[in-house]
């Protein structure tokens, strides 16, 4: 997908010089980004970075102190109703009635948008198929697995056929199989032209799904770009994780062959274009465990913020 700056794709979301303060504390600071229609854009950042506040402003739930936000052609918050009718929301926690069946929960979702029962019943079969819940239509939600509940929540967010989906930590707490099934469903939505704004702590999720992403720290944008471009720009070489020794002592030994070194807890991260030379330097330390791997978004986050993403 072409980037918004170089394409004629319609703009789904535009933030221009947006800041937000609460009680004199700046929680979002001069933030600007544009999301093209049909792309998946990720917001990455530690707790307190401003992700939730940004989402609330996009939804018109709070107004920016400074700057302008436009969503699906409507300027928030004054035209919020025009935009909200075209937005589906998946919050971090399932908003389901456990005593209702799967079908009944979808009926409730539809009524939020003032859809008639006939209209809702018309779309329920396709939503059940999308969520892979055809055989669970009359099952109580309390009897579903965690992955099934998340797929039902996602299906509910699609009840009004939204142009834009806002997903807050959509796979947190799921096992790998359930997580991959959600990712597959989200990719199918992108293939249908839906726009997705994704906030996540899961770096693999961001790397797999996002066309572009924005890394936040203390309310400021510290990086923006395509995942693999950011990895190449910020890291650009293999990584060796070193466990079992004194990180400070080991860093002095291997520094001449390292492009950069990072210490996180008891782990030494060595970014090096010459992994074999580093391994040779460490052979005398029999108690060490080494993991050599390609760089990833977790490394980018550590590089930019100096700390790991909270789990």
UniProtKB/Swiss-Prot annotation:
Membrane topology note: Peripheral membrane protein
Residues bound to ATP: 45-52
Keyword rRNA-binding listed: no
Gene Ontology annotations for the cellular component aspect, listed alphabetically: plasma membrane
GO MF term list: ATP binding; ATP hydrolysis activity; transmembrane transporter activity
One Pfam family from the record: ABC_tran
Locations listed in the record: Cell inner membrane
Subunit structure: The complex is composed of two ATP-binding proteins (NodI) and two transmembrane proteins (NodJ).
Protein name: Nod factor export ATP-binding protein I
Species whose genome carries this gene: Rhizobium leguminosarum bv. viciae
């Amino acid at each position: 997908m072409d980037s918004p700056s170089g394409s004629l794709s319609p703009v789904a979301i535009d933030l221009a010089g947006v800041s937000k303060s609460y009680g004199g504390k700046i929680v979002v600071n001069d933030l600007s980004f544009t999301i093209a229609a049909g792309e998946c854009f990720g917001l990455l950042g530690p707790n307190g970075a401003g992700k939730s506040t940004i989402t609330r402003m996009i939804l018109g739930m709070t107004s920016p102190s400074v700057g302008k936000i436009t969503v699906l052609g409507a300027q928030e918050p004054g035209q919020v109703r025009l935009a909200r009718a075209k937005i589906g929301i998946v919050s971090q926690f399932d908003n389901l009635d456990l005593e209702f069946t799967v079908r009944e929960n979808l009926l409730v979702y539809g009524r939020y948008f003032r859809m008639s029962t006939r209209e809702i019943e018309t779309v329920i079969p396709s939503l059940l198929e999308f969520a892979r819940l055809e055989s669970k239509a009359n099952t109580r939600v309390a009897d579903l697995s965690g992955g099934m509940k998340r797929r039902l929540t996602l299906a509910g967010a699609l009840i009004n056929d939204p142009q834009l989906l806002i997903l807050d930590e959509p796979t947190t707490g799921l096992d790998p199989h359930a997580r991959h099934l959600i990712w597959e469903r989200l990719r199918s939505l992108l293939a249908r032209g839906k726009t997705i704004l994704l906030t996540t702590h899961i770096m693999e999720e961001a790397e797999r799904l996002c066309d572009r992403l924005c890394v936040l720290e203390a309310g400021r944008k510290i990086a923006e770009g395509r995942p693999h471009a950011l990895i190449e720009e910020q890291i650009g070489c293999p990584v060796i994780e070193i466990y079992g020794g004194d990180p400070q002592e080991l860093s002095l030994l291997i520094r001449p062959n390292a492009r950069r070194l990072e210490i996180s807890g008891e782990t030494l991260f060595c970014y090096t274009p010459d992994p074999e030379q580093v391994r040779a330097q460490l052979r005398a330390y029999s108690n060490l465990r080494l993991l050599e791997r390609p760089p990833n978004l977790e490394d980018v986050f550590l590089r930019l913020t100096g700390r790991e993403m909270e789990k």
